[in-house]
Amino acid sequence: MSVHIEAKQGEIAESILLPGDPLRAKYIAETFLEDVTCYNNVRGMLGFTGTYKGKRVSVQGTGMGVPSISIYVNELIQSYGVKNLIRVGTCGAIQKDVKVRDVIIAMTACTDSNMNRLTFPGFDFAPAANFDLLKKAYDAGTEKGLHVRVGNVLTADVFYRESMDMVKKLGDYGVLAVEMETTALYTLAAKYGVNALSVLTVSDHIFTGEETTSEERQTTFNEMIEIALDAAIQQ
């Protein structure tokens, strides 16, 4: 048992999916997993363990943003020995050729968060995904015929920005999309020597205003979960 997770030792699998929304964690468990048990309800941040294609997998809600996901990733690794962590969530496209419903696999994540500046004063640490997980997720997506993009994303500390100038400039440097957690996940995975990946679906485009319908969002979300689960069980 840790501060924010009430699971007993052995109740959490070595491979875990990390949606921000705890209700998405519940949906994933009920829709994709078998023999499901709920191991956490502290602060309503639901966590479940079950099996997928005969392999043990867990799903844990993390909340939104760098501080929240950092809490859960730290505890999952340090207290429960989790080895493979895959964030599953949505993002907003920045590049013109990135379309809604595309799947983005984050190779790395730049950020406006000060998280790493606290650890590396005066330096910019560049956290990266685990290549084995990335390759497995990419292969799983392309085998399903999905449009999968791999590249850099922006992990932002602010959802409602007063100006999009910096986001536009990052787009000029090839950043694909913006979200709010990947930098923290990849940094902590590097710190503790475990494997991490972010698999994201594009729910809207920051500059064109295009966005998915609720039905499209659910279909794409399901496809993303299958990609993440297929990668997780191969580790």
Swiss-Prot record:
Q: Which GO terms describe its cellular component?
A: cytosol
Q: Which InterPro entries match?
A: DeoD-type, Nucleoside_phosphorylase_CS, Nucleoside_phosphorylase_d, Nucleoside_phosphorylase_sf
* GO BP terms, alphabetized: purine nucleoside catabolic process
* A Pfam family recorded for this sequence: PNP_UDP_1
Q: Where are the transmembrane segments?
A: none
Residues the record annotates as the site (Important for catalytic activity) are 217
The positions flagged as active site in the entry are 204 (proton donor)
List the CDD domains: PNP_EcPNPI-like
Reaction catalysed by this enzyme: a purine D-ribonucleoside + phosphate = a purine nucleobase + alpha-D-ribose 1-phosphate; a purine 2'-deoxy-D-ribonucleoside + phosphate = a purine nucleobase + 2-deoxy-alpha-D-ribose 1-phosphate
The residues listed in the UniProt record as binding phosphate, with positions renumbered to this chain, are 20, 24, 43, 87-90
- Cysteine pairs forming cystine bridges in this chain are none
Q: Could you tell me the superkingdom of the organism this chain comes from? A: Bacteria
* Keywords, in A-Z order: Glycosyltransferase, Transferase
One GO MF term: purine-nucleoside phosphorylase activity
- Transferase recorded as keyword: yes
Sites where the protein binds a purine D-ribonucleoside: 4, 162, 179-181, 203-204
Q: What is its EC number?
A: 2.4.2.1
Subunit structure, as described in the record:
Homohexamer; trimer of homodimers.
Homology family: Belongs to the PNP/UDP phosphorylase family.
Which HAMAP family would you find in this protein's record? Pur_nucleosid_phosp
**Role summary:** Catalyzes the reversible phosphorolytic breakdown of the N-glycosidic bond in the beta-(deoxy)ribonucleoside molecules, with the formation of the corresponding free purine bases and pentose-1-phosphate.
| Name of the protein in its database record | Purine nucleoside phosphorylase DeoD-type
Q: Which gene encodes it?
A: deoD
